[in-house]
Protein backbone atom coordinates (compact mmCIF):
# COMPACT_ATOMS: atom_id res chain seq x y z
CA UNK A 1 0.00 0.00 0.00
CA UNK A 2 0.99 3.63 -0.33
CA UNK A 3 1.38 6.13 2.50
CA UNK A 4 0.36 9.73 1.92
CA UNK A 5 2.99 12.04 3.40
CA UNK A 6 2.80 15.79 4.01
CA UNK A 7 6.11 17.59 4.40
CA UNK A 8 6.11 21.19 3.20
CA UNK A 9 9.01 23.59 3.36
CA UNK A 10 8.37 26.42 5.84
CA UNK A 11 5.51 24.37 7.28
CA UNK A 12 4.56 23.79 10.90
CA UNK A 13 4.22 20.55 12.82
CA UNK A 14 0.67 19.23 13.19
CA UNK A 15 0.89 15.56 14.15
CA UNK A 16 2.53 12.23 13.36
CA UNK A 17 1.48 9.96 10.51
CA UNK A 18 -0.11 6.92 12.16
CA UNK A 19 1.24 4.55 9.48
CA UNK A 20 4.73 5.81 8.63
CA UNK A 21 5.33 7.48 12.01
CA UNK A 22 6.77 10.49 10.15
CA UNK A 23 5.95 14.03 11.15
CA UNK A 24 3.15 15.86 9.35
CA UNK A 25 4.63 19.28 8.53
CA UNK A 26 2.22 21.39 6.51
CA UNK A 27 2.04 24.91 5.16
CA UNK A 28 -1.66 25.62 4.66
CA UNK A 29 -0.88 28.31 2.09
CA UNK A 30 0.55 25.63 -0.21
CA UNK A 31 -2.72 23.71 -0.27
CA UNK A 32 -5.55 24.08 -2.77
CA UNK A 33 -7.76 25.18 0.14
CA UNK A 34 -6.02 26.63 3.18
CA UNK A 35 -9.00 26.33 5.53
CA UNK A 36 -8.96 23.78 8.35
CA UNK A 37 -11.28 22.20 10.90
CA UNK A 38 -10.39 20.66 14.25
CA UNK A 39 -12.74 17.83 15.23
CA UNK A 40 -12.87 15.83 18.43
CA UNK A 41 -14.94 14.96 21.47
CA UNK A 42 -14.79 17.09 24.62
CA UNK A 43 -11.40 16.86 26.30
CA UNK A 44 -9.62 15.40 23.28
CA UNK A 45 -7.30 18.39 22.88
CA UNK A 46 -8.94 20.58 20.23
CA UNK A 47 -8.07 23.83 22.02
CA UNK A 48 -4.53 22.63 22.72
CA UNK A 49 -3.98 21.88 19.04
CA UNK A 50 -5.31 25.32 18.08
CA UNK A 51 -2.99 26.98 20.60
CA UNK A 52 0.00 25.03 19.30
CA UNK A 53 -0.77 26.16 15.76
CA UNK A 54 -1.19 29.78 16.87
CA UNK A 55 2.19 29.71 18.62
CA UNK A 56 3.86 28.14 15.58
CA UNK A 57 2.40 30.74 13.21
CA UNK A 58 3.42 33.69 15.38
CA UNK A 59 6.96 32.40 15.94
CA UNK A 60 7.67 31.17 12.41
CA UNK A 61 6.04 33.74 10.12
CA UNK A 62 6.59 37.47 10.60
CA UNK A 63 4.30 38.11 7.64
CA UNK A 64 1.24 36.57 9.29
CA UNK A 65 -1.31 37.88 11.79
CA UNK A 66 -3.61 35.80 13.99
CA UNK A 67 -7.11 36.83 15.10
CA UNK A 68 -9.18 34.87 17.62
CA UNK A 69 -12.86 34.97 18.53
CA UNK A 70 -12.97 33.58 22.06
CA UNK A 71 -16.44 32.73 23.46
CA UNK A 72 -15.06 30.93 26.53
CA UNK A 73 -12.11 33.16 27.53
CA UNK A 74 -9.68 30.26 27.20
CA UNK A 75 -7.02 32.02 25.12
CA UNK A 76 -6.27 34.92 27.49
CA UNK A 77 -3.12 33.38 29.04
CA UNK A 78 -1.66 32.55 25.63
CA UNK A 79 -2.43 35.97 24.14
CA UNK A 80 -0.99 37.82 27.14
CA UNK A 81 2.13 35.62 27.19
CA UNK A 82 2.80 36.45 23.53
CA UNK A 83 2.21 40.20 24.00
CA UNK A 84 -1.01 40.07 22.02
CA UNK A 85 -4.09 42.25 22.47
CA UNK A 86 -6.93 40.68 24.46
CA UNK A 87 -10.11 42.71 23.91
CA UNK A 88 -12.94 42.17 26.37
CA UNK A 89 -16.25 43.14 24.78
CA UNK A 90 -19.31 43.84 26.92
CA UNK A 91 -21.71 46.64 27.83
CA UNK A 92 -19.54 47.61 30.83
CA UNK A 93 -16.08 46.95 29.38
CA UNK A 94 -13.47 49.69 29.19
CA UNK A 95 -12.48 48.32 25.78
CA UNK A 96 -14.28 49.90 22.85
CA UNK A 97 -14.42 49.07 19.15
CA UNK A 98 -15.86 51.78 16.94
CA UNK A 99 -18.52 50.21 14.73
CA UNK A 100 -17.73 52.83 12.06
CA UNK A 101 -13.98 52.19 11.80
CA UNK A 102 -13.04 52.20 8.13
CA UNK A 103 -9.84 51.98 6.08
CA UNK A 104 -9.32 52.81 2.43
CA UNK A 105 -8.93 49.13 1.46
CA UNK A 106 -12.23 48.05 3.04
CA UNK A 107 -14.33 45.62 1.02
CA UNK A 108 -13.98 44.54 -2.59
CA UNK A 109 -15.50 47.74 -3.97
CA UNK A 110 -13.42 50.63 -5.28
CA UNK A 111 -15.42 52.86 -2.94
CA UNK A 112 -15.03 51.65 0.67
CA UNK A 113 -17.84 53.92 1.89
CA UNK A 114 -20.31 52.15 -0.41
CA UNK A 115 -19.22 48.80 1.00
CA UNK A 116 -19.49 50.13 4.54
CA UNK A 117 -23.04 51.33 3.84
CA UNK A 118 -24.11 47.69 3.49
CA UNK A 119 -22.71 46.95 6.95
CA UNK A 120 -24.42 49.99 8.48
CA UNK A 121 -27.74 48.87 6.96
CA UNK A 122 -27.33 45.43 8.55
CA UNK A 123 -26.29 47.01 11.83
CA UNK A 124 -29.30 49.32 11.87
CA UNK A 125 -31.60 46.35 11.30
CA UNK A 126 -30.15 44.76 14.42
CA UNK A 127 -30.32 48.00 16.41
CA UNK A 128 -33.92 48.71 15.39
CA UNK A 129 -34.94 45.10 15.90
CA UNK A 130 -36.97 44.70 12.72
CA UNK A 131 -36.59 44.75 8.97
CA UNK A 132 -36.20 48.27 7.61
CA UNK A 133 -38.19 49.58 4.65
CA UNK A 134 -37.12 51.22 1.40
CA UNK A 135 -37.44 54.78 2.77
CA UNK A 136 -35.38 53.94 5.83
CA UNK A 137 -32.72 52.27 3.69
CA UNK A 138 -32.38 55.36 1.52
CA UNK A 139 -32.09 57.60 4.58
CA UNK A 140 -29.49 55.36 6.22
CA UNK A 141 -27.45 55.16 3.02
CA UNK A 142 -27.51 58.93 2.60
CA UNK A 143 -26.61 59.63 6.22
CA UNK A 144 -23.78 57.10 6.15
CA UNK A 145 -22.24 58.78 3.11
CA UNK A 146 -22.65 62.21 4.75
CA UNK A 147 -21.10 60.99 8.00
CA UNK A 148 -18.00 59.72 6.19
CA UNK A 149 -17.70 62.68 3.80
CA UNK A 150 -14.88 64.57 5.54
CA UNK A 151 -13.13 61.39 6.65
CA UNK A 152 -13.13 60.19 3.04
CA UNK A 153 -11.90 63.56 1.78
CA UNK A 154 -8.98 63.20 4.20
CA UNK A 155 -8.04 59.87 2.55
CA UNK A 156 -9.34 57.93 5.57
CA UNK A 157 -6.71 59.40 7.88
CA UNK A 158 -7.30 60.73 11.38
CA UNK A 159 -10.20 59.83 13.65
CA UNK A 160 -13.10 57.92 12.05
CA UNK A 161 -16.68 59.05 12.76
CA UNK A 162 -18.80 57.19 15.31
CA UNK A 163 -22.40 56.04 15.61
CA UNK A 164 -23.04 59.15 17.69
CA UNK A 165 -22.11 61.28 14.69
CA UNK A 166 -24.27 59.07 12.49
CA UNK A 167 -27.25 59.67 14.79
CA UNK A 168 -26.67 63.44 14.69
CA UNK A 169 -26.75 63.23 10.90
CA UNK A 170 -30.08 61.40 11.11
CA UNK A 171 -31.51 64.12 13.34
CA UNK A 172 -30.46 66.75 10.78
CA UNK A 173 -32.67 65.17 8.10
CA UNK A 174 -36.15 66.48 7.35
CA UNK A 175 -37.95 63.14 7.03
CA UNK A 176 -39.86 61.89 10.08
CA UNK A 177 -38.51 58.39 9.33
CA UNK A 178 -35.00 59.69 10.05
CA UNK A 179 -36.11 60.89 13.49
CA UNK A 180 -37.65 57.47 14.13
CA UNK A 181 -34.40 55.71 13.25
CA UNK A 182 -32.45 58.11 15.48
CA UNK A 183 -34.79 57.37 18.38
CA UNK A 184 -34.58 53.61 17.79
CA UNK A 185 -30.76 53.54 17.94
CA UNK A 186 -30.43 56.00 20.84
CA UNK A 187 -29.95 53.16 23.35
CA UNK A 188 -26.87 52.05 21.39
CA UNK A 189 -25.40 55.51 20.78
CA UNK A 190 -26.05 57.45 23.98
CA UNK A 191 -27.67 54.87 26.27
CA UNK A 192 -26.39 52.04 28.43
CA UNK A 193 -25.42 49.87 25.42
CA UNK A 194 -23.23 52.46 23.67
CA UNK A 195 -19.97 50.49 23.81
CA UNK A 196 -19.71 50.39 19.99
CA UNK A 197 -20.49 54.10 19.58
CA UNK A 198 -17.17 55.29 20.99
CA UNK A 199 -13.73 55.65 19.37
CA UNK A 200 -11.65 52.48 19.33
CA UNK A 201 -9.27 52.48 22.32
CA UNK A 202 -7.55 49.11 21.80
CA UNK A 203 -4.65 48.07 19.58
CA UNK A 204 -6.31 46.50 16.56
CA UNK A 205 -2.94 46.51 14.73
CA UNK A 206 -1.34 43.91 17.02
CA UNK A 207 -0.16 40.71 15.32
CA UNK A 208 -2.19 38.63 17.76
CA UNK A 209 -5.70 39.81 18.67
CA UNK A 210 -8.27 38.02 20.80
CA UNK A 211 -11.90 39.17 20.83
CA UNK A 212 -13.34 37.98 24.14
CA UNK A 213 -17.14 37.78 23.72
CA UNK A 214 -17.92 35.80 26.89
CA UNK A 215 -19.61 38.76 28.61
CA UNK A 216 -21.72 39.89 25.66
CA UNK A 217 -25.30 39.84 26.90
CA UNK A 218 -28.37 38.74 24.99
CA UNK A 219 -29.10 42.30 23.80
CA UNK A 220 -25.58 42.95 22.54
CA UNK A 221 -24.63 39.54 21.13
CA UNK A 222 -26.01 39.98 17.56
CA UNK A 223 -24.67 43.54 17.34
CA UNK A 224 -21.38 42.60 18.96
CA UNK A 225 -20.77 39.77 16.51
CA UNK A 226 -21.51 42.07 13.56
CA UNK A 227 -19.03 44.66 14.83
CA UNK A 228 -16.35 42.08 15.64
CA UNK A 229 -16.62 40.47 12.20
CA UNK A 230 -16.53 43.90 10.54
CA UNK A 231 -13.44 44.81 12.57
CA UNK A 232 -11.82 41.58 11.39
CA UNK A 233 -12.79 42.41 7.80
CA UNK A 234 -11.07 45.78 8.20
CA UNK A 235 -7.89 44.00 9.28
CA UNK A 236 -8.06 41.37 6.54
CA UNK A 237 -8.43 44.00 3.81
CA UNK A 238 -5.53 46.00 5.26
CA UNK A 239 -3.33 42.90 5.33
CA UNK A 240 -4.37 41.90 1.82
CA UNK A 241 -3.22 45.28 0.52
CA UNK A 242 0.11 44.76 2.32
CA UNK A 243 0.52 41.19 1.09
CA UNK A 244 0.21 39.78 4.62
CA UNK A 245 -1.51 36.56 5.66
CA UNK A 246 -4.34 36.53 8.21
CA UNK A 247 -5.34 33.46 10.21
CA UNK A 248 -8.72 33.41 11.95
CA UNK A 249 -9.46 31.04 14.84
Task: Give short role names for the model-derived ranges.
Residues 1-24, 73-85, 91-93, 98-249:
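P-loop NTPase motor domains
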